[in-house]
Amino acid sequence: MIKTFADKRTQELYVTGKAGRFPPDIVKRALRKLEQINAATALSDLRVPPSNRLHALGRDREGQHSISVNDQWRICFLFEDGEAFDVEVCDYH
């Protein structure tokens, strides 16, 4: 379950479905991925589908994981005890 968001843009997207400043072509897929994170009870739940490309992050995002929205955009988050924190749709590359 998503407990917190890292930014207001991601929270608004999830709560209202409005794109805000996100590119329109990622909105539908990002919402679907956010729902997957919300439904996950274990980090391993996010390994399926393989297109999520779930992986741990390093450097300044140590402790976070991410799943792919597309080739450019990711959803980054902390996952502890079946809950997601600091969820953020981002282009960190």
Question: Which residues fall in each region the model found?
Answer:
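Conserved phosphate-interacting/catalytic interface
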Residues: 37
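A short, surface-exposed loop/turn module that caps and links secondary-structure elements
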Residues: 41-65
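Glycine-rich, flexible loop/turn motifs
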Residues: 1, 9, 18, 42, ...
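Arg/Lys-rich, positively charged N-terminal/basic patches that mediate binding to nucleic acids
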Residues: 1-33
